[in-house]
Amino acid sequence: MRSFWLFLLLLLFCISFIKLTEGNEDAKRLYDDLMVNYNRHRRPSTSPNKPLTIKLKLRLSQIIDVHEIDQIMTCSVWLKQTWIDRKLSWDPVNYGGVNVLYVPYEMIWVPDIVLYNNADSNYNITISTKATLHYTGEVTWEPPAIFKSMCQIDVRWFPFDEQQCHLKFGSWTFSENLLSVELNEPSLRYEEEIDEKGIIDNVTVAEDGIDLSDYYPSVEWDIMSRVAKRRAKNYPSCCPQSAYIDVTYYLQLRRKPLFYTVNLVFPCVGISFLTILVFYLPSDSGEKVTLCISILVALTIFFLLLTEIIPATSITLPLIGKYLLFTMVMVTLSVVVTVISLNLHFRTPTTHLMPNWVKKVFLKWLPKLLFMRRPIDDYEEKFDDKKKPKDGKIALSVHAHRVSNVGNNIRNATIDDTIQKMYYSPPVVKAFENICFIAELLKKKDRDDKIDEDWKYVAMVLDRLFLLIFSIACFVGTVIILLRAPTLYDTRQPIDLQYRPANLSANPISF
């Protein structure tokens, strides 16, 4: 019984092997018959004057990189090309029902479709793949390729920018009289387009011209549109007699701003608002100018970082560059104002006299507008009632805060009748004169101290004034500059959302 089952398995294996061999033999015979008199250098057209139609279909696999400095987009694509070659048709009945044959593309004629806006030395497809032959004569060739195409980068709204990149394909040799390149799309529309010379061209447009069914989402870019256009263009410099057809695939890319917002925009905004703290720092600390210079150095580092990201262009200034320039101007002004404030703070009565307009503006008007009040005024109000003596005797008590009133009190005091009748001895007179002299010195010193305090208060008022001005300027400048980007108000959803894998769509990264 066991031997019977082994024999049955061996018999089934032999039958399957014979069928497989017969199938391979039919395919081999078909291949030999097709290649006997086939010339792969000849254009497979039924008439020498009739153009051969090539249908193109681009399937985007991945956007590998968009290099802003070199202005190059690198992407992985599958370029599907379909045409009819009557010399490669057959009757499946004569070849054991074989209706599809796979052959190396080097063995048959293939169109010389190249990337016109190529950015490296590989203009055509170099990967060796097989073409699919159908018994009707239809040939399909869909090789994978990694293309580097030139893409003009617009840095006006960086890092909240959109870029328009394209891939332009066409035949390098055959004009429209010999090769007609068509869009392999079900829905097409036709429109007129005026070129730079004012010539009206008929353009075929496919709104969904790029297949995204196998697209792997980019971590930096969202796809907003994928239009394909077919044009016929003359090249007067080389071939003015006839036009050449090209198919251009446009990719409108919108940058995902999370990375640059966290690593570039937020630090810039933070550095900008650090400028305000310069005016809150006391002048006696001696670190006001140091803080200004430190902020200026930090902004310079960000400028150097920005030049490594964006292309060196003189056409426009990026949005973040405008904001950095605005912040640098603010920091420079803060350095100037800080130097003026420090100069006022350390002025003395022996070098500078305070003008009357400075007293009116900085000691009376501005403090009221800025809701500032000097603590010394409270002490003066408290001791105003203690200036006059109550008992008519000599008032020798020292002022709680200043001693400038001592001399006046001595001169203006009402002397006791008994003391007035006494004979003043020379030691008493000398002592009295010394007391008056000391009182004058103390009064002068007190006056100088008051002038010093007035200059310091002027510097404090100036700091408070520019603290308010710079706070408003930084806030308004940040809002006006950064919120001008159009993409911040673009509510369109990326069209590649529906093609993203389930694991990326179900667990989006939130900020």
Curated annotation (Swiss-Prot):
One Pfam annotation reads Neur_chan_memb
Q: Which residues are glycosylated?
A: N124, N202
* Signal peptide (from-to): 1-16
Q: Where are the transmembrane segments?
A: 262-282, 291-311, 324-344, 465-485
Keyword Amino-acid biosynthesis belongs to the record: no
Question: Does the entry annotate any disulfide bonds, and if so which pairs?
Answer: C151-C165, C238-C239
GO aspect biological process, one term: positive regulation of locomotion involved in locomotory behavior
Ranges in the topological domain labelled Cytoplasmic: 345-464
According to its record, how does it sit in the membrane?
Multi-pass membrane protein
Main site of residence?
A: membrane
Name the Gene Ontology molecular function terms of this record: acetylcholine-gated monoatomic cation-selective channel activity; excitatory extracellular ligand-gated monoatomic ion channel activity; extracellular ligand-gated monoatomic ion channel activity; transmembrane signaling receptor activity
Asked if the record carries the keyword Ion transport, the reply is: yes
Q: Which InterPro entries match?
A: Neur_chan_lig-bd, Neur_chan_lig-bd_sf, Neur_channel, Neuro-gated_channel_TM_sf, Neuro_actylchol_rec, Neurotrans-gated_channel_TM, Neurotransmitter_ion_chnl_CS, Nicotinic_acetylcholine_rcpt
Q: How does it assemble?
A: Component of nicotinic acetylcholine receptor. In muscles, composed of 2 non-alpha subunits lev-1 and unc-29, and 3 alpha subunits unc-38, unc-63 and lev-8. In cholinergic motoneurons, composed of 2 non-alpha subunits acr-2 and acr-3, and 3 alpha subunits unc-38, unc-63 and acr-12.
What NCBIfam families does the record tag this protein with? LIC
**Family classification:** Belongs to the ligand-gated ion channel (TC 1.A.9) family. Acetylcholine receptor (TC 1.A.9.1) subfamily.
Query: Which PANTHER family does the annotation name?
Result: NEUROTRANSMITTER GATED ION CHANNEL
Specify the protein name.
Acetylcholine receptor subunit alpha-type unc-38
Its lineage reads: Eukaryota, Metazoa, Ecdysozoa, Nematoda, Chromadorea
